[in-house]
């Protein structure tokens, strides 16, 4: 019996082997070879675009094919992102597909289809990290020299290091969304394509950090990065040590070994962080929300390769995520967004006057008019005929008038939030699109200018819960969006449009006590920015409509208020003449704008904590490039426009006063919150860095106030000692606490770190930290 069972098992195994061989042979006989790589070295984040690098080789006959990536979505259908390609005989094509990653994206496949026949298939597995994770990318000849980045511990989330090549870098900015910082060292960047450079530039503007190294091979490293360099490098120079770098992080290491650095002249807008023997060693340049760093030495060579201080350099420069205002996080409040998308005349109830008049005429005709006509005709017995006829007639009229009220043309309610940055010619757009249909049908939604479409969380517009998005030369096309009679289906979109064009001469003047913002702002575009507002950390200034070529004067706004208060959203809405809870007299446009503003600025306690200077307003003339394929539409366009301004800095005083309103922060609390009503076990950390480039030569004093109703003995506050690299407990006062030996607790870049601790069993409402730093630039 055992021998018999063994023979059966052997026979089954042979059949399986033969079938597997046949499958491989069938795939080979198609002449199609498909390879695919998901993410950045396999790394990705949820609710962000996932780049899939695809290579297709055709060794057979000419082929018209569709290459697509697909996965099973939360609704039980298939989400498919594809592109139609021509594959001539003996051809090879390489390109990126972009898949919107959700919590359901775990296993997906990349396939090549000819008609409905699958010619090749690759199965891929991904495990996308949460959005608060930190992803470092390294493009280097020796990636292992930067493995120390794995040891950096951000305040929240995990750290992941991706080893990349030039070819791995996506050609669209959306594909860079998961990446927080990129290190480029000793590789030929001249291989970067124009599309990759544009994507890199937009990624930096949207908050990415680029770290470029120098050293002996600086020419290779900078070959394709001329437009990104804070320094115009011209030659190398020998230095007899890097003591200034150790002093920058208050490290006791000598770093007295000689090394070679790549020297040059500063570009406009660049500032020196570290200078060695008169040569800029570490330089930074702000671009939008992000930063570019140039490090003139080579960290992969001695003495830096043996120096532990490089970890702190990376931690200080790269671990602190680029701060962005809440509207730039591409996240909308879903309730307010739905309200804004449904705010159109066709979905509003008919006027009460219209309804009353209609009912009045109906009652009058069916009753008195019908009676007097039949009486005059002396044919009262016909009432049993005329009444039903009149009822049917009025019912038909009601149906026709209702159909006319809904209209006969589909409507696209396009809500766009545009974010521009000074010095960048493109503005990022996050859009919500509501597709309204007067009848039950399906549409193909298409975009221009390389806009990408993605499903919203509560999207029910998919035909059979399937999502089919096809990439083309101009943008994307979303197939079979089903809309019910008088219904609205919502879709998300991302892309870029030309920036508005704003010129200014704003100056931040540092005085002994006050830091003032003043100057002029000019609209150099052909569009009117309506209800413009200048937003600063402490207040907002209504500017009214900013017409083409119009100029507004800004007169001495104080930026360093001693007790800064968050920007009040309801106050901005009131300034714009909008209401959080619309009144019956509000127009449909006012309701739509109010809801969209609240969707774009979701906030806790009705307030926004901001740093930086922004110009905001409404645009009527620039729509998001989204329409319906082969279908005329009636568009409703609402664009909320923001531009981050970069005022110049005038350091007039020998001593300056910096307050918390001039700082970005990063918190270990969930959601990067600054306040807490329940201190977690072990406490939490808040890390502050200046939002305006400032470098301190000396610190005179540091004072802070903890906004809390709890007694000082209930809370423990510690400050990070940059010299001993430890947390030091600070004795709290009831009101203002003066910090002893303040220079130890302030980094050379003005950074300050607080740690708040207390019993997790007590109710301790820490609402914020206000501090005042007196220093010498």
Predicted regions and their residues:
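Bacterial N-terminal signal peptides
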Residues: 9-19
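Extracellular ligand-binding/catalytic regions of CAZymes and related secreted enzymes
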Residues: 27-75, 81-98, 102-104, 108, ...
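Sec/Tat signal peptide C-region and signal peptidase I cleavage site
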Residues: 22-26
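An acidic, glycine-rich "communication" segment
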Residues: 209-284, 290-295
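Soluble catalytic regions of membrane-associated enzymes that act on cell-envelope
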Residues: 433-587
């Amino acid at each position: 019996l055992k021998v018999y069972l063994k023979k059966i098992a052997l026979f089954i195994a042979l059949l399986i082997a033969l079938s597997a061989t046949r499958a491989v042979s069938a795939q080979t006989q198609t002449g199609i070879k498909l390879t695919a790589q998901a993410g950045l070295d396999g790394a990705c984040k949820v609710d962000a675009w996932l780049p899939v690098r695809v290579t297709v080789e055709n060794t057979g006959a000419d082929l018209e094919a569709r290459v697509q990536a697909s996965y099973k979505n939360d609704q039980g259908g298939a989400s498919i992102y594809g592109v139609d390609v021509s594959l001539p005989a003996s051809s090879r094509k390489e390109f990126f597909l972009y898949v919107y990653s959700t919590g359901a994206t775990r296993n997906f496949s990349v396939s090549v289809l000819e008609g409905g026949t699958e010619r090749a298939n690759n199965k891929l597995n991904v495990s996308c990290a949460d959005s608060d994770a930190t992803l470092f990318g390294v493009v280097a000849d020796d990636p292992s020299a930067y493995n120390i980045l794995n040891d950096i511990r951000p305040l929240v989330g995990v750290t992941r290091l991706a080893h990349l090549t030039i070819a791995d870098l996506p050609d669209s900015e959306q594909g860079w969304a998961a990446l927080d910082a990129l290190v480029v060292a000793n590789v030929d960047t001249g291989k970067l394509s124009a599309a990759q450079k544009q994507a890199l530039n937009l990624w930096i503007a949207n908050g990415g950090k680029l770290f470029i190294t120098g050293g002996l091979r600086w020419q290779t490293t900078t070959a394709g990065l001329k437009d990104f360099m804070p320094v115009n490098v011209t030659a190398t120079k020998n230095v007899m040590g890097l003591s200034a770098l150790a002093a920058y992080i208050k490290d006791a290491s000598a770093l007295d070994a000689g090394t070679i650095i790549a020297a040059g002249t500063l570009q406009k807008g660049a500032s020196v962080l570290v200078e060695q023997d008169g040569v800029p060693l570490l330089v930074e340049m702000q671009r939008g929300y992000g930063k570019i760093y140039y490090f003139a030495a080579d960290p992969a060579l001695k003495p830096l390769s043996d120096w532990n201080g490089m970890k702190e350099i990376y931690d200080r420069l790269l671990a602190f995520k680029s701060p962005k205002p809440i509207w730039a996080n591409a996240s909308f409040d879903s309730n307010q967004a739905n309200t804004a998308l449904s705010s159109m005349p066709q979905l509003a109830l008919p006027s009460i006057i219209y309804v009353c008049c209609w009912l009045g005429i109906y009652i009058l005709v069916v009753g008195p008019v019908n009676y007097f006509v039949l009486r005059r005709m002396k044919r009262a017995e016909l009432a049993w005929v005329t009444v039903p006829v009149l009822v049917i007639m009025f019912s038909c009229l009601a149906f026709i008038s209702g159909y006319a009220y809904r209209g006969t043309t589909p409507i696209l309610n396009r809500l766009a939030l545009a974010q521009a940055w000074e010095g960048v010619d493109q503005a990022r757009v996050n859009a919500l699109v509501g597709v309204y249909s007067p009848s039950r049908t399906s549409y193909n939604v298409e975009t221009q200018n390389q806009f990408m479409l993605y499903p919203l969380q509560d999207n029910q517009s998919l035909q059979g819960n399937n999502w089919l998005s096809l990439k083309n030369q101009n943008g994307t096309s979303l197939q079979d969006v089903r809309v019910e009679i008088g219904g609205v289906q919502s879709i998300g979109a991302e892309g870029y449009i030309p920036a508005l064009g704003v010129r200014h001469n704003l100056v931040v003047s540092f005085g002994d006590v006050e830091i003032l913002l003043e100057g002029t702002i000019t609209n150099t575009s052909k569009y009117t920015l309506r209800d413009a507002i200048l937003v600063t950390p402490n207040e907002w200034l209504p500017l009214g409509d900013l017409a083409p070529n119009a100029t507004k004067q800004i007169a001495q706004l104080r930026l360093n208020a001693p007790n800064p208060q968050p920007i009040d959203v309801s106050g901005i809405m009131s300034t714009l003449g909008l209401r959080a809870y619309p009144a019956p007299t509000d127009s449909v446009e006012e309701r739509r704008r109010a809801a969209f503003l609240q969707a774009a600025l979701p906030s806790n306690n009705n307030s926004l904590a901001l740093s930086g200077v922004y110009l905001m307003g409404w645009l009527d003339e620039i729509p998001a490039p989204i329409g319906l394929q082969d279908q005329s539409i009636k568009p409703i366009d609402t664009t909320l426009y923001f531009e981050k301004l970069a005022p110049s800095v005038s350091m007039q005083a020998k001593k300056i006063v910096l307050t918390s309103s001039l700082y970005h922060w990063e918190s270990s609390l969930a959601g990067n919150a600054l306040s807490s009503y329940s201190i977690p076990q072990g406490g939490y950390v808040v890390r502050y860095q200046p939002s305006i480039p400032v470098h301190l030569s000396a610190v005179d004093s540091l004072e802070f106030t903890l906004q809390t109703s709890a007694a000082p003995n209930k809370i423990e506050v510690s400050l990070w000692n940059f010299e001993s690299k430890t947390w030091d407990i600070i004795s709290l006062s009831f009101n203002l606490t003066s910090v002893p030996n303040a220079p130890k607790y302030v980094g050379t870049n003005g950074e300050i770190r607080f740690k708040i601790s207390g019993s997790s069993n007590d109710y301790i409402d820490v609402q914020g930290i206000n501090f005042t730093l007196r220093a010498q630039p």
